[in-house]
Amino acid sequence: VKDKKIVCNDFHLKDPERIIVVTGPNQGGKTTFARMFGQLHYLASLGLEVPGTKAQLKIPDRIFTHFEREENVETLYGKLQSDLLRMKEILDNATKDSIVIINEFLSSTSLRDAILIGKQILEILTKLDCFGVWVTFIDEFSSYSEKTVSMVSTVDPADPVKRTFKIVRKPSDGLAYAIHIAEKYGLTYETLKERIKS
């Protein structure tokens, strides 16, 4: 695409770090980062070159992914139950040599339940000692233990509506920047109130 710059992202894990927890604003490149992590490990496991200036990657026995799926009306399971069953299958089969990639898991339940369930899953993953990425809106996961690392999707400091698509290693800041998106589309409380009046 003309005039579009490729955004390069780096990551590293140092012992005992195992799980990269990616937080930050919507549409900031978090899911693309998770896919990139999986693709790098997949290409390396095939013995192929990987995109990047330098890479030292673990060759996994398996790569497990948990990305959002549409609800299957034939199973009669709700979204949360379906997600939990898929996660159980991953946890039952993953080993210390596996890669686990989780994207926006637990978005279909309350924040309190999501934190509770998520911490139990992090407990299992860190005990397994496998490597992985977890993209989430739950900042608490990024500081769960010495085995978790926080990376954050960044925005342009001059204009928080603009995403940089740069994912950097830093503590989660708890900012979703949703109000800026609402302002961009004229969906603030004030503008909606004015529309209702007129």
Task: Set out the residue ranges of the language-model regions.
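ATPase nucleotide-binding head domains, primarily ABC-like/P-loop NTPase cores
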Residues: 1-198
